[in-house]
From Swiss-Prot:
Protein name: Uncharacterized protein TM_1467.1
Signal peptide start and end residues: none
A single cellular component GO annotation: plasma membrane
Pfam families tied to this protein: DUF5317
Subcellular location: Cell membrane
Membrane-topology annotation of the record: Multi-pass membrane protein
Oxidoreductase keyword on record: no
InterPro entries cross-referenced by the UniProt entry: DUF5317
Transmembrane segments: 41-61, 133-153
Hydrolase recorded as keyword: no
Domain of life: Bacteria
Keyword vocabulary terms for this entry: Cell membrane, Membrane, Transmembrane, Transmembrane helix
Provenance organism: Thermotoga maritima (strain ATCC 43589 / DSM 3109 / JCM 10099 / NBRC 100826 / MSB8)
Amino acid sequence: MMIDVFLIALLLSILTGNIKNVLKYNYKGLYLFAIPFVLQLLPWKEILVPLSFVMLFLFFIWNRNIPGFKLMAIGAVLNGFTMSVNGGKMPVWEPTLKLLNLDLDFKHTAFTEFSWKTLLADYIPVYLPWGRKFVISVGDILVFIGVFIFFVLKPRFQTQPSRVPHES
């Protein structure tokens, strides 16, 4: 679903003309953004998934002055914690999987009983108008809101016109 959210937010950013603002930011540690996604594809999930979320968190924190990044950081921490305490996989509530007729992928594991380890898991069903279905978590929602804030809301840039006092 992240791809759907990203593409919708990007399209809205282009349509509203806010894309020029997105390109103006001075991003810190931009290399840290892609590496975590690659790490999550590799074996040794118990080690690499927590490491990937630490890298994402650092990227978001280093860029916390950019609108939406604080929410993305909080969402990433919630998801990273949940995956870390569940063997590197995100738990998905099995009844929701069955309701949506979805299968698990390599990054997810099913659960049927809630515990402290699954409190922040994927259990919220989402139906998109174009027929795609997902199960998402509270952390995902925070990340998605952060992405929309980043792409769509117009920032209050630091370069405000200087005020010259009136001479009497």
